[in-house]
Amino acid sequence: MSLMSNFFEKSDVSRKEAESIISDTLQKCDDGELYLENSKSESILLDDNKIKNSSYNSDLGFGFRAISDEVVAYSHSNEISKNSLKQSSENLKSTLKSVKGTYNHEIPKSNKKYYDNINPIEQKSLNEKIKILNDVNDYLRSKGDKVKQVTANFLGEQKSVEIIRSGGETLSDVRPLVRFNVSVMVEKDGRKETGVYGVGGRQSYDSYLKLSLIHI
């Protein structure tokens, strides 16, 4: 099942209508596109033996760009609707009204997939992630009374992007991103030292957790 966002699913504008607005806006331009982005992120922080923070954010929006000769016009909105697209279209046309160009459909392009089509945020439940953080905290504190402070956190993100060019040509991508960090402070005879470990990248949490827990 694809995790690519359907940017028009909850909008009053259909994909066909959006493509029509894009083609109409760019017909006298050299180049341009509608760039759609849906970003979801989470952060879970354990500190001082308890979960100090847990947050989730979701952002949706678009950028509309038109290029004619040496002039670049750009408009953006965090609302994907018929009105916002039409307003952006009018803004671009107004900026480029005295400049004429010819849309280039032959610009080299690629839609190569670099990352797995996954949403790391949904691969584990919130309770599972909290349990892992608590287990890490318990394990490190079990190493002795010298361990005075343990901080551990998860950071996860999934970003879906789609680019629509004149004529309905579409390029899309899904970009996962995760991070797992641990910080430990130890104290002996009044001397404090801190060690930090972190790992992450554009894969799932599980891709890093097994290796991380072995190192810890």
Predicted regions and their residues:
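Short, compositionally biased low-complexity segments
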Residues: 1-3, 61-64, 101-115, 186-198
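Short beta-strand elements
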Residues: 55-68, 171-200
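Broad gene-expression machinery/nucleic-acid interaction feature
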Residues: 31, 43, 59-63, 72, ...
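Short, solvent-exposed aromatic-acidic interface loops
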Residues: 78-80, 197-205
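N-terminal alpha-helical targeting/anchoring segments
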Residues: 42-97
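Generic structural motif
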Residues: 39, 69, 80, 157-159, ...
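Acidic low-complexity segments
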Residues: 2-23, 29-43, 83-173, 205-213
